[in-house]
């Protein structure tokens, strides 16, 4: 069809319905009445010859064709919005903006202290809120702007997202300094004989450790499994268990909990830690500023 047959305002309504899945909510956010939104949807359906959204018990569900249109429409509207607002600026020292960042507990331990120290000097009124990448629907939350940036190994963030490599995690074995039998460098035989504490970190690269070890024919004597890395330090401090952890995490635990590390006896691949943001906010001045700060503070490149 010819682009001249489409009213740009109809695409704005389409985009809002994609985000809210509700005619009334979309109308409220756009400053339109519910009948006006319904009429816009009717016109767009006629122009595109598709229902686009179907009313269900869960709200207005997009059709396959609507989902096919979603990314290019969102990208086009965002590009146009950026072009119209290029004069906007971001003053970090004066800003009171809250940035929502998705990361694991390891991410909080590694990223937050240097980030908050830098913000205290450069952006004293900015607030940071963190959440887990698997706490909800991360793709939708980043598309809607509810989450500004995500950090980690997040293979689900592909189409519609930009990413920047920060560094690579190397795995090590960690245990208490006065462990009766664990030594560095640790052999595969010793690694297999000792008892382990493991972390089930779903939807992160760290959740692949068991699979990597099994494919290498290495079995762990798993004594304890926990859902968060944050518990590993205190547990190793008071037990004879050992753990497979990222090296940067180990550095933060060694002194506070009296721990030490050994190069990992298994040839585990490094884990790439990337910074992700949605294409809609690629030119958002505040998002750009915070991304650059992360690169400055944490990038190995």
From Swiss-Prot:
PROSITE patterns to which the protein is assigned, alphabetical: HTH_LYSR
Entry keyword set: Activator, Aromatic hydrocarbons catabolism, DNA-binding, Plasmid, Transcription, Transcription regulation
DNA-binding region in chain numbering: 23-42
GO molecular function: DNA binding; DNA-binding transcription factor activity
Gene3D superfamilies in alphabetical order: Periplasmic binding protein-like II, Winged helix-like DNA-binding domain superfamily/Winged helix DNA-binding domain
Keyword flag Transcription regulation: yes
Function: May regulate the expression of the naphthalene (nagA-F) and salicylate (nagG-M) metabolism genes.
Family, as annotated: Belongs to the LysR transcriptional regulatory family.
Protein name: HTH-type transcriptional activator NagR
UniProt lineage: Bacteria, Pseudomonadati, Pseudomonadota, Betaproteobacteria, Burkholderiales
Gene: nagR
């Amino acid at each position: 069809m010819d682009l001249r047959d489409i009213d740009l305002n109809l695409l704005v309504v389409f985009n809002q319905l994609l985000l809210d899945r509700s005619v009334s909510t979309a109308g409220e956010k756009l400053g339109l009445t519910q009948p006006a939104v319904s009429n816009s949807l009717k016109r767009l359906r006629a122009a595109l010859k598709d229902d686009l959204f179907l009313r269900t018990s869960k709200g207005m569900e997009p059709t396959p064709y609507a989902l096919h249109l979603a990314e290019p429409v969102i990208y086009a509207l965002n590009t146009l919005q950026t072009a119209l607002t290029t004069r906007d600026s971001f003053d970090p020292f004066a800003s009171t903006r809250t940035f929502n960042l998705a990361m694991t507990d390891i991410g909080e331990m590694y990223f937050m202290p240097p980030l908050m120290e830098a913000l205290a000097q450069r952006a004293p009124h900015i607030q940071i809120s963190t959440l887990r990448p698997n706490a909800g629907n991360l793709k939708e939350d980043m598309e809607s702007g509810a989450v500004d940036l995500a950090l980690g190994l997040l293979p689900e963030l592909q189409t519609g997202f930009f990413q920047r490599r920060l560094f690579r995690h190397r795995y090590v074995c960690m245990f208490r300094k006065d462990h009766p039998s664990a030594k560095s460098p640790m052999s595969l035989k010793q690694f297999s004989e000792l008892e382990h504490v493991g972390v089930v970190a779903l939807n992160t690269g760290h959740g692949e450790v068991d699979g990597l070890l099994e494919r290498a024919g290495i079995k762990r004597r798993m004594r304890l499994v926990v859902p968060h890395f944050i518990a590993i330090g205190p547990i190793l401090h008071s037990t004879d268990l050992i753990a497979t952890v990222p090296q940067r995490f180990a550095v933060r635990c060694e002194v506070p909990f009296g721990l030490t590390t050994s190069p990992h006896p298994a040839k585990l691949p490094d884990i790439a830690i990337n910074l992700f943001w949605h294409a809609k906010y690629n030119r958002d001045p505040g998002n750009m500023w915070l991304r650059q700060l992360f690169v400055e503070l944490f990038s190995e490149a």
